[in-house]
Amino acid sequence: LSYKVIFGVLAVVVPCLLIFINLAVQPDSILIEKGILKSYQQNRILSFLYPDEYEDKEAYQQLNSVTAIGSGQLDGKGYKTNEISSVKNGNYILEPQTDFIFAVIGEEFGFKGSCTVVVLLLLIALECLSVAAKAKDLSGAIIAAGMGGLIIFQSFINLGVVTFILPNTGLTLPFISYGLTSLVSLYMGMGFVLNVRLQCKRG
């Protein structure tokens, strides 16, 4: 991609995003009146912009998640730590095995464990893109590239939420978060990617 295309897209997306956020945070937002935005979604955006005002409400889990990841330091507190101050044992995060599983990983396995998870997810996504580049036909390339893009996008959003870089979205961490529908969908997608790769070898 050329820089002209990249800057052109940014020139359109950034102002639109700023306008959307400005409309979303208004008390009587037109986005809520039109049904484009739900009230709980507005609260999530507000809690991201003003965490101190929502520290006991919508921002509670994200703030505790950041604390948990930081408390793991380099090596972590150990697998299934019994410390009452941990996010699991202290119930500081509701259902940590779902959207906020990375907070538990950061706390129990530290920076090293967190980096390992990120690298593994990145390797899976890169392998999908590699299969897409070698695919025999366009449909196979789209399937493999789509799965790679999905894993990268979903991982980025989830990690952004857990580290409070992004507002809470409810997206799971691929292959790790608890959730039958998410896991089955991802495994089915990876099965398609493996099939595309098999077709490449046969060709």
Name each model feature, range by range.
Residues 70, 74, 124-127, 134-137, ...:
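Hydrophobic alpha-helix feature that most strongly marks membrane-spanning transmembrane helices
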Residues 6-111, 139:
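Hydrophobic, glycine- and aromatic-enriched re-entrant/interface helices and adjoining loop segments
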